UniProtKB/Swiss-Prot annotation:
Coiled-coil regions, chain positions: none
Stretches the record annotates as G4: 165-168
Region (G2): 89-93
Gene (name only): cysN
Keyword match Nucleus: no
PROSITE patterns membership: G_TR_1, G_TR_2
Pathway this chain belongs to: Sulfur metabolism; hydrogen sulfide biosynthesis; sulfite from sulfate: step 1/3
UniProt-recorded Gene Ontology molecular function terms: ATP binding; GTP binding; GTPase activity; sulfate adenylyltransferase (ATP) activity
Region (G5), start-end ranges: 202-204
Name of this protein: Sulfate adenylyltransferase subunit 1
Organism: Alteromonas mediterranea (strain DSM 17117 / CIP 110805 / LMG 28347 / Deep ecotype)
Oligomer status and interactors: Heterodimer composed of CysD, the smaller subunit, and CysN.
Native organism taxonomy: Bacteria, Pseudomonadati, Pseudomonadota, Gammaproteobacteria, Alteromonadales
A Pfam short name: GTP-eEF1A_C
Length: 471
């Protein structure tokens, strides 16, 4: 019995060690309606042996009732989980699925293709490293294909695989494949996507999805799964700009005061000179503390506690950065804004803007233009409606430390919260600061009030008192 327990323990340890060393790729699938997004994900799960027997039996049964593939098992039903999705044969919600191979772990976001669900797609794409854009070989590059590509570019996704699907319906024609490739690359010249790859597939038949197909001898590339396993995403991490939004002031006893949070970009080590923003106070890193003990260096995306050599005033929402590499610090910024509420965006209405751990009141001071996501044309607008995207000027009541979104996604993004309903109504990406408004005036507090407020925040951080010197 003891021998069996030991073997079981060794198997568990071996399994954990194997998966611990794998890196993870987050990707989304997007494309026009009925291009086969859900079928492709079902094929990836099926061919990578990630479907249990009871799941396969269930979708085999459902295929006879609501399937769209005739006598074959409708693999899209693995992903289209909502009853309304199955009955209509479309994807509405963002469906997340997880699978792994010997080389890598994956999280898939299957996003809806309809224009009225743009906000769902933006939500699914916001954390992804790569996008698979499906193009129906029968119809080529459509308006929806261009819209999804624009959104992928807007959200800073650097890797795109254009999967030209349903090649079986076009007799695996090389001419069709090359024409679509040419059309897409011509359109993509307007976008900021540095890495674009192409693959001809049939999600229904499995051609070039996991294994290389004999039906496309003219294609000298690798199958889709091999692309996903081998694409390099480590270089996308920003290791240059150290940014550490403070989540919590950790003070377990009178002898220890640290600042807990996650390194969202860059790296830091004891001895590095840092600046706390927005106060501008400087110090040096004393320790990098983790659950497993002190570390010589902290990297993105580690969660750590930093201690400093000096007792400077830092609270939740502040950002610790290296003194020789400062972010933008201002009260006004030009941004891209995706509106997600059925109530239209009204300029000069008070909203709450949340950056990482910092929340600050503010307004949309001006809508520069609205971007037509289908044609990329810009037009004047008085307000933004649900699923519309615009370039807007935002103004906050206090300075905010952030970076342009294209340089640093974690510190260049924010969400907009309705102060009345507490619902998320928008998502934004910083383009740049608006010069000439870096000045900030504070209400007149007495010296005693300022000192007392600092004392309370230092010794009772769990009270979450507001720093009145920043009001």
């Amino acid at each position: 019995m003891n021998n069996e327990n030991e073997l079981l323990r060794q198997d568990i340890l071996s399994y954990l060690e194997q998966h611990e060393k794998k890196d993870m790729l987050r990707f989304l699938t997007c494309g026009s309606v009925d291009d086969g997004k859900s079928t492709l994900i079902g094929r990836l799960l099926h061919d990578s042996k990630m479907i249990y027997e009871d799941q396969l039996a269930a979708i085999t049964k459902d295929s006879k009732k609501v399937g769209t593939t005739g006598e074959k098992v409708d693999l899209a039903l693995l992903v289209d989980g909502l009853q309304s999705e199955r009955e209509q044969g479309i994807t509405i919600d963002v469906a997340y699925r997880y699978f792994s191979t010997d080389k890598r772990k994956f999280i898939i976001a299957d996003t809806p293709g309809h224009e009225q669900y743009t906000r769902n797609m933006v939500t699914g794409a916001s954390t992804c490293d790569l996008a698979i854009i499906l193009v129906d070989a029968r119809g080529g590059v459509k308006v929806q294909t261009k819209r999804h590509s624009f959104l992928v570019s807007l959200l800073g996704i650097k890797h795109v695989i254009v999967a030209i699907n349903k090649m079986d319906l076009m007799d695996y024609s090389e001419e069709v494949y090359k024409q679509i490739q040419e059309d897409y690359l011509k359109f993509a010249e307007q976008l900021d996507i540095p890495d674009i790859q192409f693959v001809p597939i049939s999600a229904l038949e499995g051609d070039n999805v996991v294994g290389k197909s004999e039906k496309t001898p003219w294609f000298d590339g690798t199958p889709l799964m091999e692309m996903l396993e081998n694409i390099e995403i480590g270089e996308d991490d920003n290791l240059e700009d150290f940014r550490f939004p403070v989540q919590y002031v950790n003070r377990p006893n009178l002898d220890f005061r640290g600042f807990a949070g996650t390194v969202v970009s860059g790296q830091v080590a004891p001895g590095d000179e840092v600046t706390a923003l927005p106060s501008g106070k400087k110090s040096k890193v004393k320790q990098v503390v983790t659950f497993e003990g002190d570390q010589e260096r902290a990297y993105v995306p580690q969660a750590v506690t930093l201690t400093l050599e000096d007792e400077i005033d830092i609270s939740r929402g502040d950002m610790i950065v290296k003194s020789d590499n400062l972010p933008l610090l201002n009260t006004q910024f030009k941004t891209h804004l995706v509106w997600m509420s059925e109530e239209p965006l009204m300029p000069n209405k008070q909203y709450l803007f949340k950056f990482a751990t910092k929340s600050t009141p503010g307004v949309v001071a001006h809508i520069d233009n609205q971007i037509d996501v289908n044609t990329l044309e810009e037009a004047d607008a008085m307000h933004l409606n649900l699923n519309e995207i615009g370039v807007v000027d935002v103004k906050f009541t206090q300075p905010v430390a952030c970076d342009p979104y294209k340089r640093n996604r974690p510190t260049g993004s924010f969400i907009v919260i309705d102060r009345l309903t507490n619902g998320t109504v928008g998502a934004g990406m910083i383009i740049d600061e608006i010069a000439g408004d870096a000045q900030h005036t504070s209400p007149n507090f007495s010296e005693f009030e300022l000192e007392f407020n600092a004392l309370v925040r230092k010794h009772f951080p769990h009270w979450n008192s507001v720093d009145i010197s920043k009001l």
